């Protein structure tokens, strides 16, 4: 079932894309490259749009405890004062 409706829809939607070449769709090779380009583009766009929303909380969550520990640790305060 290579010609599933979902994949066909994706290929058809990306027909306007410069990377996609629907003319050589019959050959599996071109179709795969087209899908690959679409996926790559989607990931980049997703990163562009939700990069801050998705990455920021994770980074803060990972860093905040580290900062607090450093701030509360006596060695850090001592180094800072001296």
Swiss-Prot record:
Superkingdom, taxonomy of origin: Eukaryota
Region (Disordered): 60-82
Misc: Completely overlaps YOR072W.
Name of protein: Putative uncharacterized protein YOR072W-A
Organism: Saccharomyces cerevisiae (strain ATCC 204508 / S288c)
Lineage of source species: Eukaryota, Fungi, Dikarya, Ascomycota, Saccharomycotina
């Amino acid at each position: 079932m290579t010609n599933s409706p979902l994949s066909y829809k994706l290929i058809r939607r990306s027909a306007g894309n410069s990377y996609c070449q629907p003319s050589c769709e019959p050959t599996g090779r071109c179709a795969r490259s087209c899908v690959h380009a679409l996926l790559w583009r989607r990931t980049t766009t997703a990163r562009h749009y939700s990069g801050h929303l998705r990455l920021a909380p994770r980074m803060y969550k990972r860093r905040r405890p580290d900062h607090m520990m450093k701030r509360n640790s006596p060695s850090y305060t001592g180094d800072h004062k001296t």
